[in-house]
A protein has these predicted regions:
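Alpha-helical scaffold domains
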Residues: 1-222
Length: 222
C-alpha cells in the first residue's frame, strides 16, 4: 500500500467512540480513531516499510503516526529527521511512539541528551522516554551511565513540566529494574522524591509510585 491507500484504510477503520477517547488523550482533531488491534493487524500486513512510515508520520494524522511507529526501520532514522519529528509532537502517545523509535536508532544517546535538555515539554518528555527504553534494552551500559541520571531526576523532577515529570518517573523505574545495585539506588531516590504529581487530564491514567513499581517488577522476574 502507498501512503494514500494506507490513510484511506485507517480512515475506514476508525470509530467515533475511539475518536472521542483519543481526543481526551490529546490526539487533536486529525484522528480517525483506529483501535490498537486494527493497527497491529495492519502492522502484520505491511511489516517494515520505512518510506511508508515516513510519509505516514509526516501526514500529521494521529493514527497514521501510531502505525508509522510500528512499521518504521529505526536504523534508517537520521538525527535530523528525529529532531524534525519531535518538534511536531502533540500528545504523550505520539511522544512514547517516537521515543521508542529514537531509542533503537543509531543516534539514540546523543538524541536523548539533546531532547532532555530542551525547554519544550514534549521534546524533553521524549528524551526521558528514550532513556527509559535504553535502560531496558542496552545491557552493555555500565551502572555509572545511569547513576548520573538518577541524580538529575532527583534534583529536577519537582520543578519539571507536567509530562516531563511522568517520563522522568518512568525512567527512574526503568533504571531501577536493571539490576540489584541500581534498584537500591533508584528506590532510595524515589523515597527522597516522594509522590510525583502529574495532571493526566480527563483520562484514567496515573503516574505510578516508582519504589513500589520497581519492587513489584523485580519480584515478578524472580
Amino acid at each position: 500500500m502507498n501512503a494514500q491507500e494506507t490513510l484511506d484504510t485507517l480512515k475506514s477503520l476508525g470509530t467515533e467512540q475511539n475518536r472521542k477517547i483519543y481526543r481526551r488523550h490529546g490526539a487533536g482533531e486529525d484522528v480517525y480513531g483506529v483501535s490498537f488491534a486494527h493497527l497491529k493487524d495492519l502492522k502484520k500486513k505491511i511489516k517494515i516499510d520505512h518510506d511508508l512510515a515516513v510519509a505516514l508520520w509526516e501526514s500529521g494524522n494521529h493514527d497514521a503516526r501510531m502505525l508509522a511507529g510500528m512499521i518504521a526501520d529505526p536504523k534508517r532514522l537520521d538525527a535530523r529527521t528525529l529532531d524534525t519529528w519531535v518538534k511536531g509532537l502533540r500528545n504523550y502517545v505520539e511522544t512514547d511512539a517516537l521515543g521508542g523509535l529514537a531509542a533503537k536508532s543509531p543516534h539514540a544517546r546523543e538524541t536523548m541528551a539533546r531532547w532532555i535538555a530542551s525547554d519544550e515539554e514534549w521534546t524533553a518528555s521524549a528524551g526521558w522516554r528514550v532513556l527509559a527504553q535504553v535502560a531496558m534494552d542496552d545491557d552493555a551500559l555500565p551502572d555509572e551511565y545511569f547513576e548520573r541520571f538518577l541524580s538529575t531526576i532527583e534534583r529536577d523532577i519537582d520543578e519539571s513540566q507536567n509530562r516531563v515529570r511522568h517520563e522522568m518517573n518512568n525512567a527512574l523505574i526503568a533504571i531501577g529494574i536493571r539490576n540489584p545495585a541500581l534498584q537500591e539506588k533508584a528506590v532510595a531516590a524515589a523515597a527522597r522524591i516522594g509522590k510525583v504529581e502529574v495532571d493526566h487530564g480527563e483520562t484514567g491514567c496515573k503516574t505510578p509510585d516508582a519504589a513500589g513499581y520497581i519492587r513489584k517488577t523485580v519480584e515478578r522476574k524472580k
